[in-house]
């Protein structure tokens, strides 16, 4: 029975924010207290502009979708839709194979 009393005291401390180095306040600030951040939805540039095509022979356009280290940038950052992201990855790999884009940058 004693261990149950100790555990219940520990649980009370954690709920109040006193235990384990907490600041003593609630675990998280209330969301209603501050203004929520509105993030604008990203639109795929290839879907928005039908004239823009993915071409492995265009390293200037492809370099927008690779980092300075040579890695492909994920679609959640660039805003490219899934079908165009697949085409982009194929185009980047082709451009790397024929030495239009670097595999890695030192």
UniProtKB/Swiss-Prot annotation:
Q: Does the keyword Flavoprotein apply?
A: no
Q: Does the keyword Kinase apply?
A: no
Q: Which PROSITE patterns match?
A: RIBOSOMAL_S18
Write down any Gene Ontology CC term. cytosolic small ribosomal subunit
Region (Disordered) residue ranges read 1-32
The processes (GO biological process) annotated in the record are:
translation
SUPFAM superfamilies assigned to the protein according to its UniProt record, in alphabetical order: Ribosomal protein S18
Q: Name one GO molecular function term.
A: small ribosomal subunit rRNA binding
How is this protein organized at the quaternary level? Answer: Part of the 30S ribosomal subunit. Forms a tight heterodimer with protein bS6.
Q: Which HAMAP family match?
A: Ribosomal_bS18 (MF_00270)
Q: Tell me, what does this protein do in biology?
A: Binds as a heterodimer with protein bS6 to the central domain of the 16S rRNA, where it helps stabilize the platform of the 30S subunit.
Write the protein's name: Small ribosomal subunit protein bS18
User: What is the originating organism of this protein?
Assistant: Magnetococcus marinus (strain ATCC BAA-1437 / JCM 17883 / MC-1)
The lineage, from the top, is:
Bacteria, Pseudomonadati, Pseudomonadota, Alphaproteobacteria, Magnetococcales
Gene, per the UniProt record: rpsR
